[in-house]
Regions:
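Walker A (P-loop) phosphate-binding loop of P-loop NTPases
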Residues: 80
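Conserved lysine of the Walker
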Residues: 83
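NTP-binding/hydrolysis catalytic cores, primarily Walker-type P-loop NTPases
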Residues: 226-283
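Phosphate-binding/switch region of NTP-binding enzymes
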Residues: 205-241
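Hydrophobic positions on the alpha1 helix immediately C-terminal to the Walker A/P-loop
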Residues: 86
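Glycine-rich adenosyl-nucleotide cofactor-binding module
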Residues: 21, 28-76
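Single conserved hydrophobic/aromatic residue that forms the stacking wall/gate
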Residues: 1-9, 14
Length: 283
């Protein structure tokens, strides 16, 4: 394999989908560093996550219904929270007859059983600064491919404008993505900030777009015993009183510890208010 070497952040995926990151001297003071991030050879399903204790059957069934009913969903969490793994598991609920387009920096998603699947991968510029294909370029291209859903592995910058304004608000309900955030409200603030990087609109107008486009945020995290959990499921209610209004539907409740393991599970704390898509889907 050949990596276009830069001082910082040279990246590539190798044949088994592992992600390789290289940092060189003098930035790496003690010498070159290569980090290899490996992924399971077999896709982790939602039932596997239930067995691991990441969420309950009830929460998984709720997620199955909102995915099949084409709610627009963001998965948030910190580094290593399992966002890509969870997005993979959620995508298994998508009806197999739909046309799905996935867009990623590095092709990590393992969507299976969908015949009409288009996978797009961004490309970095070469050492001469040419040939770059960005996530934003790919979203714009995907919109011309008649998708039923668009799944973006992760949004980090101005491409959020196209994901929110063009995909989710433009008839592609059921679209999904992930983002780094400490909690659902933080995810909303990050989405607003990233959209402001790509479009010249007042904050209020951006907030209205986000509130109209996004339905659900599922927040993941690693708790103190290092296990990964679904910590919160938040509903986006709309825009009112100068801010995006939300409602917590499910929340992780800790009940104690046993053998240094945290005991607890995600519990339902409120009913979904915006049930229109569920009703339209026959639930």
């Amino acid at each position: 394999y050949e990596i276009p070497l830069r001082l910082v952040g040279s990246e590539m995926c190798i044949r088994d989908r592992s992600r390789v990151n290289v940092v060189l001297k003098p930035v790496a003071v003690n010498g070159p560093i290569m980090t290899i991030r490996k992924f399971p050879s077999k896709a982790i399903k939602m039932n596997d996550l239930i067995k691991m204790g990441s969420l309950t059957k009830e929460a998984a069934e709720f997620i199955r219904k909102i995915v099949r009913s084409k709610y627009n969903i963001f998965v948030s969490g910190g580094t290593g929270a399992g966002k890509t793994t969870f997005l993979n598991a959620m995508s298994d609920f998508i009806p197999k007859e739909e046309r799905i387009i996935t867009i990623e920096d590095n092709a990590e998603l393992q969507i299976q059983g969908v015949e009409n699947l288009v996978r797009l991968e961004a490309r970095e510029a070469n050492l001469e600064g040419e040939g770059a294909v960005t996530i934003r370029d790919l979203i714009k291209s995907a919109l011309r491919m008649r998708p039923d859903r668009i799944i973006v592995g992760e949004v980090r910058g101005e491409e959020t404008v196209d994901m929110i304004s063009s995909a989710m608000l433009n008839g592609h309900s059921g679209s999904m993505s992930t983002g780094h955030a400490n909690n659902p409200k933080d995810m909303l603030h990050r989405i607003e900030t990233m959209m402001m990087m790509g479009i010249d609109l007042p904050l209020q107008a951006i907030q209205r777009q986000v509130a109209s486009a996004l339905d659900i945020i599922i927040h993941l995290g690693r708790i103190r015993d290092k296990t990964r959990k679904v910590l919160m499921i938040e509903e986006i209610l709309g825009y009112e009183d100068g801010k995006i209004q939300t409602k917590t539907l499910y929340e992780f409740k800790e009940v104690g510890t046993e053998n240094e393991k945290v005991k607890g599970s995600i519990m339902k704390v409120a009913e979904l208010e915006n049930t229109g898509k569920l009703v339209a889907a026959g639930y």
